[in-house]
């Protein structure tokens, strides 16, 4: 299950108690204080990693707790400190304080770490309180409690290419073709209920690092107002470097394909006004349903209505025209 939002309580460990103890040796009946300090409690640290893709591991968890520090011991022995708890989250995670809404950190780099809940300090044993005046202190202090923090985690996928389109525009079929993987395909709305990630290999430069492609669930009119799957998935376009609009141009009895693109542009602009700063390409999909002269007429219609956009005629089903996508990706993404 793809989980991209979660609330957790992160509890650091309590510090161990200091102890009162006395040095006891045969020839030192009054050997003085010998109680050790308590160990520090473990802290809770969040770490970003590219090896996990969602918060599924924490789906049924309300809180995570680091170990407590151990109490001190005789012979001036300090208690063992609690081990820090490392919470692994996907790169692209936005961390907020659940109580204030304050953004604490934006994890965009693999290996980034942030200490979120500090472990409690260990208490002091009576040896710590020995002075020239008080040579036999009977005082020891308890360990301090660890910090407890309620946080919200929100994932915004980091991908090179994001497939954007209405339900049943053929995004999943095209995704399977480009990423050489399989996601569920069907002729009904919202076949894709969660973003799918795949890798696209550059055909002309096989030594190059693959591109990450994301199949964003179908957008409907009013998505920016949280209709359909709405805002839950619109946010996944925010960090995508290149947007690939997928438009169904097959013969059908509904809105014109041009109106579909107009609506998609409106929805994305309403959610992220500066989205057009990204590289964009429009794939006119399902041309296997059109005759050659109809394909050319379709292309000219789009070019006339949207002169600032780049278009490619393709069939995700047959693979026709897909090489044009690879060429565009190479021009815009290859380094």
UniProtKB/Swiss-Prot annotation:
Residue positions binding Mg(2+): 172, 192
Chief localisation class: cytoplasm
Record keywords: Cytoplasm, GTP-binding, Hydrolase, Magnesium, Metal-binding, Nucleotide-binding
InterPro entries from the UniProt entry: G_OBG, GTP-bd, GTP-bd_Obg/CgtA, GTP1_OBG_dom, GTP1_OBG_dom_sf, OBG_GTPase, P-loop_NTPase, Small_GTP-bd
GO MF terms, alphabetically ordered: GTP binding; GTPase activity; magnesium ion binding
Signal sequence range: none
Region (Disordered): 126-145
Keyword Flavoprotein in annotation: no
EC number: 3.6.5.-
KW Isomerase (keyword) present: no
Domain (Obg): residue spans on this chain: 1-158
Locations listed in the record: Cytoplasm
Residues reported to bind GTP: 165-172, 190-194, 215-218, 285-288, 315-317
Pfam families: GTP1_OBG, MMR_HSR1
Sequence ranges assigned to domain OBG-type G in this UniProt record: 159-334
SUPFAM superfamilies: Obg GTP-binding protein N-terminal domain (SSF82051), P-loop containing nucleoside triphosphate hydrolases (SSF52540)
NCBIfam families on file: Obg_CgtA, PRK12299.1, small_GTP
Family per similarity comment: Belongs to the TRAFAC class OBG-HflX-like GTPase superfamily. OBG GTPase family.
Subunit structure: Monomer.
Record function comment: An essential GTPase which binds GTP, GDP and possibly (p)ppGpp with moderate affinity, with high nucleotide exchange rates and a fairly low GTP hydrolysis rate. Plays a role in control of the cell cycle, stress response, ribosome biogenesis and in those bacteria that undergo differentiation, in morphogenesis control.
Descriptive protein name: GTPase Obg
Gene designation per UniProt: obg
């Amino acid at each position: 299950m793809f989980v991209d939002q979660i609330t957790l309580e992160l509890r650091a460990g309590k510090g161990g108690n200091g102890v009162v103890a006395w040095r006891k040796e045969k020839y030192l009946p009054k050997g003085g204080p010998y109680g050790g300090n308590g160990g520090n409690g473990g802290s809770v640290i969040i770490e970003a990693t590219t090896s996990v893709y969602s918060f599924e591991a924490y789906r049924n968890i309300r809180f995570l707790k680091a170990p407590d520090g151990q109490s001190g011991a005789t012979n001036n022995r300090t208690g063992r400190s609690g081990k820090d708890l490392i919470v692994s989250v996907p790169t692209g995670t936005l961390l907020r304080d659940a109580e204030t809404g304050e953004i604490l950190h934006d994890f965009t780099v693999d290996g980034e770490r942030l200490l979120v809940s500090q472990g409690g300090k260990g208490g002091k044993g009576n040896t710590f309180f020995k002075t020239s005046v008080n040579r036999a202190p009977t005082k020891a202090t308890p360990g301090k409690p660890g910090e407890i923090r309620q946080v919200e985690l929100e994932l915004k996928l980091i991908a090179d290419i994001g497939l954007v389109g209405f339900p049943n525009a053929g995004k999943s079929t095209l995704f399977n073709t480009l990423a050489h993987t399989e996601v569920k395909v069907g002729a009904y709305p919202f076949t894709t209920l969660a973003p799918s990630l795949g890798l696209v290999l550059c055909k002309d430069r096989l030594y190059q690092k693959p591109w990450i492609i994301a199949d964003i669930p179908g957008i409907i009119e009013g998505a920016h107002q949280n209709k359909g799957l709405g805002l839950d998935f619109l946010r996944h376009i925010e960090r995508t470097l290149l947007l690939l609009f997928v438009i169904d141009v097959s013969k059908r009895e509904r809105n014109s394909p041009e109106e579909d693109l107009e609506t998609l542009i409106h929805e994305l602009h309403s959610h992220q006004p500066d989205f057009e700063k990204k590289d964009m390409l429009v794939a006119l999909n399902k041309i296997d349903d059109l005759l050659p002269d109809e394909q050319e007429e379709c292309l000219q219609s789009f070019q006339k209505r949207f002169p600032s956009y780049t278009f490619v005629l393709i069939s995700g089903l047959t693979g026709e025209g897909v090489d044009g996508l690879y060429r565009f990706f190479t021009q815009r993404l290859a380094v």
